[in-house]
């Protein structure tokens, strides 16, 4: 019986199969996991929070405060339990004028670490800028209890005390001298601190030492020349010294850094009014109102500038809106501004009385003039202007005038008594 012959294996096919299996295995383990499909977005690594913090600091130095705040928010999202990020962001928010948000972030930092001196200090500064001086003073004192060598806290304390001195709201019996001492301590502890130089400049400005104040603000400006507030303060000091061109230049720099803030345009308008350039004053006052159309203070200032430019119809429109409240042409609600001892608000009221008198609306003019006389009897300028409004009305009544149309600079016609078409009573030099 013959044995069946066995078929010999095909070693070539076997080898090929083994190679194919090995190749597929290699691709599965090493090639496919690293392959990037052109149809799938490429994954990017999330930057560490430190990268965002560095970016925020660079943006702050460039004066890009809103972008710096956004960078801190990104760092905060990655590291939500780090109180130092909250504090750093709050400091920038104070410079940016976001005082409520600065207060919130400093308080959030304190929730993470109640004994953080810098968080208490920044909270104090935010409260100070909101006019809450008593709570600000309590917060900064606690910051100094936690760290007596906190230079920023000493600087903020000096500014808080200066505000208390200027508003007469301080509890200390020697507010001014304490503020001076605190500003000097801040500079001793940190001679290269922007906050320390700013605080020292502020107390010098408050005490009328304008040239020394300018030097301190210039020192702050050398540390960072992209801070709006420093340029505003420099401008105010130059204006107080009568250096109006330099004042306008500094206000212009401030406006460039933060065009959304109407403060610089407001101050430029008042500076031009001081030197009698009323057309320019009107231009910048209008720009300020465009930035915040519902602000009665800006509207009142615009009314004063219209009056100074002998544009009574527009002056009365703006002053009435500021003092009585109402709605702007584009539908924004304006809350009436109440008469206080603030020199600018007083100016809005007596200017309103004057323009009412010039337009022979004497019943209203007398009410406003008498209100000014009863509320601010110690303000000599206000008394003079209120009396002038009353005298105009007395002349109007005595002359029995015939209405005469007068066109404003914007082409509007307003019936005005022939007895009151003379040049308006000049206002006092606007208060810095």
Describe the residue ranges of each PLM region.
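Residue-level recognition of tetratricopeptide repeat
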Residues: 57, 91, 125, 159, ...
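Register position in tetratricopeptide repeats
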Residues: 61, 95-96, 129-130, 163-167, ...
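Alpha-helical segment of the N-proximal tetratricopeptide repeat
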Residues: 45-84, 88-98, 129, 166-170, ...
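Structural marker of alpha-solenoid helical repeat scaffolds
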Residues: 78, 112, 146, 189, ...
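Helix-start (N-cap) detector for alpha-helical repeat units in TPR-like alpha-solenoids
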Residues: 49, 83-84, 117-118, 151-152, ...
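Canonical positions in the second alpha-helix
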Residues: 74-75, 108-109, 142-143, 185-186, ...
